[in-house]
């Protein structure tokens, strides 16, 4: 209700894997604004993009949350799966046929599943948002069939599922922090990447 007397003054840290302009950071800052407003300014959440609290390492970022090094976090399930591999289920390709179906699952049984898995690691699940279905971009050629992926060096997040999928399709997957992707494509270290359109635009 925003009555400041009802809330203890406190500063919290929120770790985010995305860049400053990525939807992860935008959502995190909006969340921080809402908390500040509704606590009468007593609860301040400082948002740290690019996993700066963990030296740019997203795996360490989620580990810090689990041990209390960061108070809050906004991470993709493929990153959270470094804590609990069973969370990779949502990153399996072609699991959903539409945004509506994905939203319905995540808002009900899927969210309950996440909450249980994360609670076992000492993390409280507050909710979710999405970056959109993933789209492939690359600097070499159009990809319209699985065969077109053969030999392409594709950046993937640090996820066993993504590594396995792209290897199976004949690509050469490389795990890399998102903040390094644009430069890596320019330098030819990788040929491309796959993400939701909003994430790709943020590069």
Can you say where each PLM-predicted feature lies in the sequence?
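Short, low-complexity disordered leader/linker segments with a strong preference
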Residues: 1-11
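Residues at or immediately flanking beta-strands
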Residues: 11, 42-46, 153
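Extracytoplasmic "Venus flytrap"
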Residues: 13-30, 50-55, 200
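Short, polar/charged alpha-helical segment
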Residues: 21-46, 70, 160, 164
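Contiguous mixed-secondary-structure segments that line small-molecule binding/active-site clefts
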Residues: 33, 63-66, 71, 76-172, ...
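A structural preference for short, hydrophobic beta-strand core positions in alpha/beta folds
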Residues: 45-49, 175
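Pocket-lining segment of extracytoplasmic ligand-binding domains
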Residues: 161-163, 172-203
């Amino acid at each position: 209700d925003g009555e400041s007397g009802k809330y203890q003054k406190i500063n919290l840290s929120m770790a985010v894997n995305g860049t400053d302009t990525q939807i992860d950071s935008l959502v995190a800052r909006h969340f921080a604004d809402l908390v500040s407003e509704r606590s009468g300014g007593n609860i301040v959440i400082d948002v740290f993009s690019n996993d700066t609290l963990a030296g740019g390492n997203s795996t360490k970022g989620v580990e810090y949350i689990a041990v209390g090094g960061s108070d809050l976090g906004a991470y993709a399930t493929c990153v959270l799966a470094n804590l609990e591999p069973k969370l990779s289920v949502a990153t399996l390709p072609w699991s959903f046929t539409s945004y509506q179906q994905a939203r319905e699952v995540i808002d009900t049984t899927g969210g309950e599943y996440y909450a249980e898995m994360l609670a076992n690691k000492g993390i409280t699940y507050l909710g979710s948002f999405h970056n959109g279905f993933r789209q492939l971009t690359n600097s070499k050629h159009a990809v319209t069939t699985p065969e077109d992926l053969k030999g392409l060096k594709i950046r993937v997040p640090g996820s066993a599922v993504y590594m396995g999928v792209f290897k199976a399709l004949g690509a050469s997957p490389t795990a890399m922090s998102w903040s390094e992707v644009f430069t890596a494509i320019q330098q030819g270290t990788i040929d491309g990447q796959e993400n939701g359109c909003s994430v790709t635009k943020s590069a």
